[in-house]
Amino acid sequence: LTLIASEPLGWDGPDLPGLSEDFLAHFGALGTLDWTDRQAVAAFLLETERLCAGPDFDAGFEAARIDHILDRTESPASMFNHATMSVAEDWTGAFRRIECPTLVVHGEGDPILPLPNGEALAEGIPDAALMVLPGTGHCLPARHHAAIARRIAAHIRGA
């Protein structure tokens, strides 16, 4: 199992840090965003990516990627539906019952799920390994792809 930029759902320890103030302020605009205005949506998504990326943000690449996404989707607002999910089952402490070999990959400067979330997850899963990506936010920059792939391959071989 490989968990990337994740949090320990069902966490029952001391409070873990959450979204950065910049991210909360940005997401506060979701309610007033005109989802029929492609330029406004693209600008909102580009700022979301900038806030997620950390120092490796490539505005040109991300703008092109967002255009491609908007060309292919009928409902860009649905990208944010996961925030409305709820569960009926109590998951308190359930992550501690994971029994398979687990690798947790987390960005050092993640503004959505700050590093203590990844650390708590890795510490709570028996024998889990933690790979911290220096200078990285919530997204996986291309400069880390090869190292992540090697680490996942080694993790799989060792499982």
Please provide the spans of the model-predicted regions.
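Solvent-exposed polar/charged
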Residues: 96, 123-124
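Short beta-strand/loop motif that positions the catalytic acidic residue
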Residues: 98, 104-106
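Alpha/beta-hydrolase
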Residues: 21-93, 100, 120
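Conserved alpha/beta-hydrolase "acid-adjacent" motif
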Residues: 111-117
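Catalytic active-site module of serine/aspartate enzymes centered on a nucleophile-bearing elbow/loop
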Residues: 127-159
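Active-site acidic short loop of glycosyltransferases
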Residues: 99-100, 127
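Flexible "cap/lid" loop of the alpha/beta hydrolase fold
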Residues: 2-34
